[in-house]
């Protein structure tokens, strides 16, 4: 641990912390340990492991962390293209207590000759980037590493993250960061350690300030070169120098002119002293000379000026968005004949419209969408209630609050992240995971418990020999985990009928299902919704439908299974589909939309069609109808959904869900 010293106590530059301070630090450490113990009871089971050597493998990480408890999954994150290690990974434990033990015992352990950093995994990026409890330490001695810094600052509270910045060779850059779980702990460390001596060097300890926020909160920038504009054409260099010379000695003064010698209306004045330049800016900015108001400020490089203008522009956009929050509406699925005036006419009964516009391409053709801004959020709410889904000309409108693209993408990403599966309990014996009607939850990979080696799955599920690639040797097919599972008595009756049918053969016979075990029954509750396959309307399927899984299985065809390329339903015109939706039960509406949407999505993203379709079905019906009618809108939404899926996959790499995905049999099941 680095030696903490008071500044200037003796000839050696400092002395050890006195007894009272040491007692106070010990008390703080005890409090921190208690807080950490309490956090462990409610804490996460997922750990982040950083500073991994490039040669560390998943198996090495597993072996290293197994000594602290039961490990559920491990993952070393790698580049998707080169498969090289990114220098970090994740470890998931069965219990929070095991994770807490690993954090305390394995943090800074050497793995392949390099000390690793272990901390709790924080999935929410807003929490990681919030800056709460984050402090900055600079002027560190080169000998202070991650472990020494952690030991020094752990006396003030539980540490979420601790890091010393290093160069490519591993040498300390002389500064680091420590993040506590609360601002109070961070402030305590700042109060006690700022200005103290660590290894005979006085350190600065203060709140962490984001790079983009450092200039406004830091010291005033010093400058000597002054920019002045809005000058009169008759003003000369000597007159300008005379005005600025009252504030100090100037080294240069020039008015910019064109090729003919005419003034461009601006110039530069350079002072010898920065304080004189600052006083000149404060005194002359906004003053009127020759009936013209001067602008006087610090001379900036082009890049600095562009950055400042960009920040001002973004701030103005944010203020405008905040001002119109809840009152600006987005309208989609507009008929091409709808103009700005017609759109205003339709929405005028609901309140005062401040702006109304139909979006058009460069040639003037309507894009089918627009915006309507009301004076109050209440008026906008009434408009949404009355106009969403209303038929205008020949199309149902989609009306919702307008959102920026970044906000909409963040919302979709947050929704998809919440649908990720939680850690599953360890398997007890061979089992299969079953799902109720509606399919597995959106975004969840299918996981089936694996039996002992060479064990043939228990009977009770039919086989899709045509659909499953990678048949077993000897013609034994992979089991179809999506075959409808009926009650045992009903299945026996159908099997007897099919065996008596001439030419029924193996195609018409279904194996008898066994009663699921209690372990399987516990896993049959739904965790979410995900569209799996387009299928026929359940009302057209003969026979019982209770306790059946939603699959593309046509009972009326004698037990045959649909081929991937065989049509499952005929396309329905949009107007007819909208009418059928209005008359259908709520539980059937999603299926009807999915039957029409899934084939279109599959053409764009065949590998992720199920997930993307499930995401799109979460939207309002009117918007889904618009996607069915507009290939351009569908392509844009599918692209946006794929971006969300990739972003979530990257952020949650190494989690338990990803580990389960790697064990999934989903690749062997054709949607």
Swiss-Prot record:
Q: What happens in the null mutant?
A: Pab2 and pab8 double mutants show significant growth and development defects and more resistance to Turnip mosaic virus (TuMV).
Per the similarity annotation, which family is this? Belongs to the polyadenylate-binding protein type-1 family.
Which SMART domains does this UniProt record tie to the protein?
PolyA (SM00517), RRM (SM00360), RRM_1 (SM00361)
Supply the PANTHER family for this chain: RNA BINDING PROTEIN (PTHR24012)
The entry's other comment says: A.thaliana contains 8 PABP genes.
What tissues is it present in?
Answer: Expressed predominantly in immature flowers.
Q: What is its main location?
A: cytoplasm
GO MF terms here are: mRNA binding
Source organism of this protein record: Arabidopsis thaliana
Its gene name is PAB8
Tell me where it resides. Answer: Cytoplasm; Nucleus
- Keyword tags: Cytoplasm, Host-virus interaction, Nucleus, Repeat, RNA-binding, Translation regulation
- Chain ranges of the RRM domain: 45-123, 133-210, 224-301, 327-404
Q: Which InterPro entries match?
A: Nucleotide-bd_a/b_plait_sf (IPR012677), PABP-dom (IPR036053), PABP_1234 (IPR006515), PABP_HYD_C (IPR002004), RBD_domain_sf (IPR035979), RRM2_I_PABPs (IPR045305), RRM_dom (IPR000504), RRM_dom_euk (IPR003954)
Give GO BP annotations, semicolon-separated: regulation of translation
Q: What is this protein called?
A: Polyadenylate-binding protein 8
Q: Tell me the SUPFAM superfamilies matching this sequence.
A: PABC (PABP) domain (SSF63570), RNA-binding domain, RBD (SSF54928)
What spans are recorded as compositionally biased (Low complexity)? 483-501, 508-525
Q: Pfam families from the entry?
A: MLLE (PF00658), RRM_1 (PF00076)
Entry's PROSITE patterns? PABC, RRM
Q: Which domain of life is it from?
A: Eukaryota
